[in-house]
Amino acid sequence: MEFNDVLNRRYSCRAFANETVEQEKVDRILEAGRIAPTAVNKQPVHIWAVSNPETLEAIKGVTRSNYGAPLILVVGCRPDEAWVRRYDGKNGAEVDAAIVATYLMLAAENEGLATLWVGSFDPAMLQKILPDSAGYEFVAMINVGYPAAESEPSAMHGERKTKEELVTILK
């Protein structure tokens, strides 16, 4: 798929088919997350790839955004391992995690899969479910799977600011 097609096709899917994602596709998606850039290549990020039914069921309790995805990629970051901007002390961990999560979503779209970025969840409850998550701050839960037949972009999906509203060009 052409890169611009990937960008234009991706939407927030809120209805997933009851179909398992092939392991080869999962591996390619995770590789995209692994090679995503991070500030000073510190890589203060971790991905939990959740597909086992018991853990997926437990995760339902941490958010109201449950749409039947067979795979959830939880992205977390460790601020203590991240680059910090010296001018104002801004920690780059969350930005790094957001970059990784975006790579994961675009890679999934490239594989013919749908995604939903979920940011509304209880991180303390999630911490109790995911192994080896102490010290991590959770940034996103990316729902991944084949879209259900009835799935379609929301009515506001195509609403975008104009280039003039979004961009200032300095020549």
Regions found by a protein language model. Give the residues of each.
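C-terminal helix-cap and adjacent tail motif
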Residues: F3-T20, K25, A140-K171
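Glycine/small-residue-rich phosphate/adenosyl-binding loop
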Residues: K25-E31, I35-V100
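Alpha-helix/helix-capping structural signal
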Residues: E54, F121-A124
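Short hydrophobic alpha-helices that are characteristic scaffold elements of the AMP-binding
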Residues: L106-E109
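Structured binding elements
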Residues: G112
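Short beta-strand segments at enzyme active-site cores
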Residues: T115-G119
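Short, electropositive alpha-helical surface patch
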Residues: M125-V139
